């Protein structure tokens, strides 16, 4: 072992191994981060996460792991986008920010025109923008809790004669504008955006009849559809590990569904699409607009495959490991958008060799692990086995977005997840999962968070040059006589120069 070239400071965080969650399938907990290294540099901080099988009653076997900073990400992701909260209510706001929609969900309802028409203003016409990009489809419209229109069945009988026109523009172009009057001429096209035009009759169709929409459309309107098409590097033959015609720099090749399977609800691909951004007339409309060459595209292949893995449910059947469905706006901080999606797929962003990528939890403990011992630790160390009991929780409760007709994309509670408190005092953490639209999946994610929080110990020390052989996120073994560690499993969670 050489100590001549450089030193690496290493810190450790305890994590749990895979456990089984009654009723919701397999839960996962752990740690994984990214780092880069250059020969001869000196690292001031690197963090490892320790894995202790059998350390808690929930632990039954070595298995999958996820980010050790999951609790911090959970708190950040708990801030729900205003676009998500307000999308069920139509509002006329000239300064409303652009919206981006992912997955199969309730789309935005930005009212761009609200104009009374007719000789006696017996009609009212509306233009509602659902996304500042092309969407896959717009399939349903609901007024309050009543279905008003479907793409297959047209206008519902209850509204027949009063909801007189429903027209979808996906997207608006110079050739398909809808003329209402001088306030909204045919040249008002919302170019590149997906929108819906509605016309309602506010008076009865006979002397004795009354309109079911005398005040026009209600304030609560739900427009359901499938959102942004995504780029999938698995379908790109120019990317290592990919095969197909998708291209990161050509959004005409992007898809929501491929060969009958939805890919637009895959959180890894949504994050990639958000980073690439969506253009209208060669100008960035939504997203970050990053260049493909700045991205570690093969890492998104791995992450997308993990999201698509089937998880067996205790009640029978399977579901994809991770799916996300959400609406965001350009007013949202880019970090909050990414954190919301990352948190819902046990993910983290990486920066390795100058390229930004993604890493999701998976079982990487079965291969050959890098091993360190006393000779690798160059100086003083800091070992904090666990935080104060007052800083941990034994109960997690919160909400998820229910897409059923009973809730129509409102948030509802998932059953509280709990373990026994060490001192008998319950401490509750509230975690909302607005981008998750399945109750079982929400429970599974909440269980992961609770399990991770039980393993937050940290170890920090200066390591020798051999530590350049690992990168943040790697599991390693550490034998350290001072603390009695013998091939103790750890995971690198932070590394800095």
Model region roles, listed by residue range:
Residues 1-4, 8-15, 19, 25, ...:
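Polar, S/T/G-rich
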Residues 20-34:
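Membrane-helix interface motif
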Residues 45-59:
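Hydrophobic alpha-helical transmembrane segments
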Residues 133-138, 146, 371-433:
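Acidic, small/polar-enriched beta strand-loop surface segments
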Residues 147-152, 366-368, 407-409, 486-487:
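Surface-exposed loop/edge segments in extracytoplasmic proteins
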Residues 302-353, 419-497:
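An acidic/polar, Gly/Ser/Thr-rich interaction patch typically located in mid-to-C-terminal regions
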Residues 356-357:
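Extended, well-folded interaction surfaces typified by the phenylalanyl-tRNA synthetase beta subunit core
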Residues 360, 400-402, 494:
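Flexible glycine-/small-residue-rich
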